[in-house]
């Protein structure tokens, strides 16, 4: 959400509590991306018109291709491509994807192949062909972990594989990057 709001998580929680989703909440954490973009535009006192689209499948991408002319009336169009995120999760959860993406090179190749044959490449070409800038960014990368570190916590510790939040966490401090005071890091 920081990439959309231009703020650190702690700032989002303080400035826009209605858009903040706590770590232990059952609610999806990415449901407020469009309103967070709006808050950033307003904070910088811009009068931009914008659109927000989250592409979960090729059918939605095809719809975007059809409405490109209407998108060009906006000063900003945000398109979230969920495929790479879904692929990174599937790499740990799906045996077939694990077979296809056994190495980092294979994973990148699979991602590249998807991009070259997806409607996303055509979408970018159409937008760029009209003289508009296409900026591609990411909210996080992916690292394949071969030797995970064990972090043990109580029953209230979150289950996220990328990071742990909780009290009384036990781990080897030589092998884990920890932030003891998350608020000082803006988290």
Language-model features: where?
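Feature captures the catalytic ectodomains and active-site-proximal regions of enzymes
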Residues: 1-187
């Amino acid at each position: 959400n920081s990439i959309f709001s231009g703020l650190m998580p702690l700032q989002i929680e303080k400035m826009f509590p209605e858009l903040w989703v706590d770590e232990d909440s059952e609610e999806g954490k990415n449901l407020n991306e469009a309103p967070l973009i709006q808050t950033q535009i307003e904070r910088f006192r811009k009068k931009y018109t914008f659109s927000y689209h989250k592409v979960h499948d090729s059918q939605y991408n095809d719809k975007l291709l059809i409405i490109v002319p209407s998108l060009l009336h906006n000063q900003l169009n945000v398109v979230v491509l969920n495929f790479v995120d879904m692929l990174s999760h599937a790499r740990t959860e799906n045996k077939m994807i694990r077979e296809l993406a056994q190495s980092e090179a294979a994973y990148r190749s699979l991602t590249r192949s998807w991009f070259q044959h997806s409607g996303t490449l055509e979408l970018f070409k159409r937008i760029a062909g009209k003289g508009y800038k296409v900026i591609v960014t990411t909210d996080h990368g992916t690292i394949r972990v071969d030797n995970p570190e064990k972090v043990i916590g109580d029953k209230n510790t979150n289950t996220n594989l990328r990071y742990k939040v909780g009290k009384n966490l036990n781990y080897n401090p030589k092998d884990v990057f920890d932030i003891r005071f998350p608020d000082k890091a803006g988290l």
